[in-house]
């Protein structure tokens, strides 16, 4: 640590110091600043709906706030919420998940970080197909892992192959990130390709982290 480092900077952990600012939020902040200055701007940063939350959702939230049943905090979340998520997963995705296997978080970023924190040890590598959502590498670093990029371009429809993944695998590889549909490209893997990647991961004892946000 250099002598020029300020006291406030020295109080920040090495984990926090290793991550970068969100490029998405940086671009979004710049766009909003330009709009506030009267400049015409079309923002391609953070995705924010331009329509209000439907009334029935607002009404349900208000009713829940008024119901004493929901005034008590539970870190495991309400059993009926987990049951509803399990039911939706079966209905929409076609596979059955026990409610006891469901963890409710305050958003996708929390879920992704906690998942990496639960399975990564310092120095473990995570294969990350690129292009990717900017949160992934920083979540991996914050959890002590090392992101390893595998680039997929327009020639492959922005989809990585098993051969590419195998070329990136090392003794330190512990996780492969699999996102379909992809954010930001929108690429969708075929059933055959998804199965091939899954079989490859099982063969080498790797975790598969999926994000279907």
From Swiss-Prot:
Location in or out of the cell: Cytoplasm
Q: What are its GO cellular component terms?
A: cytoplasm
**Keyword annotations of the record:** Aminotransferase, Cytoplasm, Pyridoxal phosphate, Transferase
| Record GO biological process | amino acid metabolic process; biosynthetic process
Top-tier EC class: transferase
Instruction: Specify the superkingdom.
Output: Bacteria
Matches recorded under CDD domains: AAT_like (cd00609)
Any Pfam family the entry gives: Aminotran_1_2
Cofactor(s) it depends on? pyridoxal 5'-phosphate
Q: Identify the EC number(s).
A: 2.6.1.1
* Matching InterPro entries: Aminotransferase_I/II_large (IPR004839), AspAT/PAT-like (IPR050596), PyrdxlP-dep_Trfase (IPR015424), PyrdxlP-dep_Trfase_major (IPR015421), PyrdxlP-dep_Trfase_small (IPR015422)
Q: Catalytic activity annotated for this protein?
A: L-aspartate + 2-oxoglutarate = oxaloacetate + L-glutamate
Q: Which family does it belong to?
A: Belongs to the class-I pyridoxal-phosphate-dependent aminotransferase family.
Q: How does it assemble?
A: Homodimer.
What name is this protein filed under? Probable aspartate aminotransferase
Q: Which organism is it from?
A: Streptomyces griseus
Taxonomic placement: Bacteria, Bacillati, Actinomycetota, Actinomycetes, Kitasatosporales
């Amino acid at each position: 640590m250099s002598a020029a480092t300020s006291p406030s900077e020295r109080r920040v952990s090495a984990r926090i110091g290793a991550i970068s600012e969100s490029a998405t939020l940086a671009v979004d902040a710049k766009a909003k600043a330009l709009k506030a200055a009267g400049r015409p701007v079309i923002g391609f940063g953070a995705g924010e709906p331009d329509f209000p939350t439907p009334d029935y959702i607002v009404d349900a939230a208000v009713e829940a706030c008024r119901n004493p049943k929901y005034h008590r905090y539970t870190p495991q979340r309400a059993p009926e919420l987990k049951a509803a998520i399990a039911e939706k997963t079966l209905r929409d995705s076609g596979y059955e998940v026990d409610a006891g296997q469901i963890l409710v978080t305050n958003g996708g970023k929390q879920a992704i970080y906690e998942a990496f924190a639960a399975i990564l040890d310092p120095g473990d590598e995570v294969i990350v197909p690129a292009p990717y959502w900017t949160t992934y590498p920083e979540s991996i670093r914050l959890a002590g892992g090392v992101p390893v990029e595998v680039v997929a371009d327009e020639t492959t429809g922005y989809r990585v192959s098993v051969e590419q993944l195998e070329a990136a695998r090392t003794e330190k590889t512990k996780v492969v990130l699999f996102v379909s549909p992809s954010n930001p490209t929108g690429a969708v893997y075929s059933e055959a390709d998804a199965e091939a990647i899954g079989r490859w991961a099982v063969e080498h004892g790797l975790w598969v982290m999926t994000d279907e946000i």
